Curated annotation (Swiss-Prot):
One of its GO terms (cellular component) is cytosolic large ribosomal subunit. GO terms for molecular function: mRNA binding; structural constituent of ribosome. It comes from Pyrococcus horikoshii (strain ATCC 700860 / DSM 12428 / JCM 9974 / NBRC 100139 / OT-3). This is Large ribosomal subunit protein uL13. InterPro entries: Ribosomal_uL13, Ribosomal_uL13_bac-type, Ribosomal_uL13_CS, Ribosomal_uL13_euk/arc, Ribosomal_uL13_sf.
Length: 142
């Protein structure tokens, strides 16, 4: 089991690395999901996520698609988009993923990993928004 600290990691790069680990059969736990960052212009990011959460079918709005508002679910959905979700292999890989806001008690004394290639300090122009800020904008709790 790998425990990854998402604090200061770029969401897309984190998601692609984690998706690869899941497909290789590893169990992955991500902590501090609200501190992962999405790079780009703040207003563009907010408008993109706001538009996604408003998507519904005209015939029956209860049929989806459904996009999350909580920060841990935003990270899970991003990783799901990088897995072959419609196959049995992809669904089994997705079940091996756990994402938490903050650090739960059971993982506080464990060694946390980070992904150096995905850290925000490697950006030349640091324009970014945290996943927690996006979740607050969408009306999520965390």
């Amino acid at each position: 089991m790998r425990i990854i600290n998402a604090d200061g990691l770029i969401l897309g790069r984190l998601a692609s690395r984690v998706a690869k680990m899941l497909l290789e059969g590893e169990e992955v736990v991500i902590v501090n999901a609200e501190k992962a960052v999405i790079t780009g212009n703040r207003e563009v990011i907010f408008s993109k996520y706001k538009q996604r959460t408003g998507l519904r079918t005209l015939t029956n709005p209860r049929r989806g698609p459904f996009y999350p508002k909580r920060s841990d679910e935003i990270v899970r959905r991003t990783i799901r988009g990088m897995l072959p979700w419609k196959t049995d292999r992809g669904r089994k890989a997705f079940r091996r993923l756990k994402v938490y806001v903050g650090i739960p008690k059971e993982f506080q004394d464990k060694q946390l990993e980070t992904i150096v290639e995905a850290h925000v300090s490697r950006l030349s122009r640091p324009k970014y928004v945290t996943v927690g800020e996006v979740a607050k904008f969408l009306g999520g709790k965390f």
